[in-house]
Amino acid sequence: MFSPEPFAVMVAPSRTMFIVPPLPLHVIHYFGGVENLKGKKVAMTWAYSPSYGKPLSVPQGVIGLFTRFGMDVTLAHPEGYDVMPEVEEVARKNCEKYGSKFHKTNSMAEAFKDADIVYPKSWAPFAAMEERTKLYSAGDQAGIDALEKRLLAQNAEHKDWACTEEMMKLTKDGKALYMHCLPADITGLSCKEGEVDNSVFDRYIVPLYKEASYKPYIIAAMIFMSQVKDPVKVLMDLDAADSHRKLH
């Protein structure tokens, strides 16, 4: 059902994108093991933010990774907030290989319906990020300023895309696991209108910090794997040696 190697997407002959976030560790622990993830519904949804240009790594990581666990993944966003098509194709291929489901919708409520996990987070459209990269490469500050103004106006059209108490009631038994990579745009706390209601965020603050606590281990693992040719062998040798670190 699950392939253990890091998630990598060849997005073009000259660029490979690796996404290895702490997401799986958190949900594996929360649901009591990898074997309990199959069939769980995940709602990866766009959410309103008063800022623009947030990265695509989270939605792409979720649809690319969670479909490898046999999970039912729904990607929801307003028209025009598409992620990289190559990553969507990875998700579809994972469905064929691991018996997962991948669905797209322009309805946040549809995605939240009976979901076991919800991940409402803002991101910028992939096309806009491509445009911004070109403008920065050209040193076109006027173009960058115009793009920012346009994207902020685009975001403002979708303020109803927020993780509210009413939206959470649509989830499975009204108790889906709320996830966010942090920091979140919290309505009434960090901003006037944002990704999530203050009451929802506050209720999930403990699991949110547990999720964040896995990041150092993931970073260490990525550094280790980039420096060692055969990481599995090295780890097995260390385990077999049964040596203990000495404190001086």
Language-model regions, residue ranges each:
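Low-acidity, Ser/Thr- and Arg-rich intrinsically disordered low-complexity segments
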Residues: 2-7, 13-18
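A glycine-rich, Thr/Ser-enriched phosphate-binding loop motif common to dinucleotide/cofactor-binding enzymes
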Residues: 15, 19-29
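Catalytic-loop motifs flanking and including active-site residues across diverse enzymes
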Residues: 22-23, 58, 214-219
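Glycine-rich phosphate/diphosphate-binding loop of Rossmann-like nucleotide-binding domains
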Residues: 31-134, 138
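Short, conserved loop/helix-junction motifs that constitute active-site signature segments
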Residues: 36-37, 67, 166-175, 202-203
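Rossmann-like adenosine-cofactor binding region
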Residues: 92-197
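Adenosine-phosphate binding glycine-rich loop
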Residues: 171-248
